[in-house]
């Protein structure tokens, strides 16, 4: 099935095919998917071999450092990936069992980087320029992958790029953040339809609001009341006018 999906993705114009062996969610791991696959190197070989063979585009892999703290087999999985034709690997600095409950560690990623020749991207606890410097310096990785820290904050990429390049970067104003949120909501409604789109939009509104000088308890309480796409857009516009009036 994964090989078939890869072929379809390539036919649709995908630049890369990315295999996710990093997700620690229970509902995913219960189906022997995501980071649960790290416990079965033989199955990993079969999957990677099939997907690489079926894909006309480069195939990349996203993974964790291993199933648990005792069994960190990240180096083994990374070597398998390289031998099976994977073009690059993004590694999250936690095991499957750690989920997001402990700080990311970069020593295992550094060991993986030293053991293979394909590009390695470091992932985990990268939230700003200083944490990006730390992750890169500790791992000697070829690049960064940012996940949760981008929720509600798409500017994180330009801010980290500026920090790494030693350039000045200007924080977006609350008004600019709300304008981008408004545009995002309209795109969600167009993609999913207004009913489903409004449900998907709720978490994005909360994420964006977390970067504004508004009390979080007000955000959550308010979100329980604004359920329709019309109400959500009006709410964002109302918040925008508040900041405009403050000057």
Regions found by a protein language model. Give the residues of each.
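Conserved beta-alpha-beta core of the PfkB/ribokinase-like small-molecule kinase fold
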Residues: 35-37, 44-54, 61-63, 69
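Glycine-rich tight-turn/loop motif centered on a GG-T
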Residues: 26-43, 94-106, 167-168
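Short, flexible active-site-proximal loops enriched in glycine and acidic residues
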Residues: 13-24
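Active-site glycine- and acidic-residue-rich loops that bind
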Residues: 1, 58, 63-76
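Glycine-rich anion/phosphate-binding loops
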Residues: 1-14, 36-43
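Conserved beta-strand positions in the central sheet of alpha/beta enzyme cores
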Residues: 18-20, 60, 90, 145
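Alpha/beta catalytic cores of nucleotide-metabolism and tRNA/nucleoside-modifying enzymes
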Residues: 46, 54, 70-88, 100, ...
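Active-site beta-loop-alpha junctions enriched in small/polar residues
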Residues: 22-24, 64-68, 94-96, 125-127, ...
């Amino acid at each position: 099935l994964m090989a078939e999906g890869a072929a379809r993705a390539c036919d649709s114009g995908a630049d890369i095919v990315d295999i996710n062996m990093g997700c620690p969610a229970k509902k995913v791991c219960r189906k022997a998917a995501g980071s649960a696959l790290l416990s079965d190197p033989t199955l990993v070989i079969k999957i990677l071999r099939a997907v690489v063979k079926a894909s006309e585009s480069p195939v990349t892999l996203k993974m964790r450092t291993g199933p648990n703290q005792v069994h960190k087999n990240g180096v083994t999985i990374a070597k398998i990936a390289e031998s099976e034709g994977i073009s690059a690997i993004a590694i999250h600095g936690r095991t499957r069992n750690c989920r997001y409950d402990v700080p990311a560690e970069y020593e295992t990623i550094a060991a993986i980087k030293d053991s293979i020749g394909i590009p390695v991207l470091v992932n985990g606890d990268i939230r700003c320029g200083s944490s990006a410097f730390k992750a890169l310096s500790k791992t000697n990785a070829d690049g960064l992958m940012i996940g949760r820290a981008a929720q509600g904050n798409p500017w994180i990429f330009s801010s980290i790029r500026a920090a790494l390049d030693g350039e000045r970067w200007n924080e977006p104003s609350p008004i600019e953040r709300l304008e981008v949120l408004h545009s995002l909501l309209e795109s969600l409604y167009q993609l999913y339809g207004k009913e489903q789109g409004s449900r998907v939009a709720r978490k994005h509104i909360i994420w964006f609001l977390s970067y504004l000088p508004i009390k979080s308890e007000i955000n959550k309480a308010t979100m329980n009341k604004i359920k329709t796409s019309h109400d959500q857009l009006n709410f964002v516009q109302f918040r925008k006018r508040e900041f405009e009036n403050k000057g």
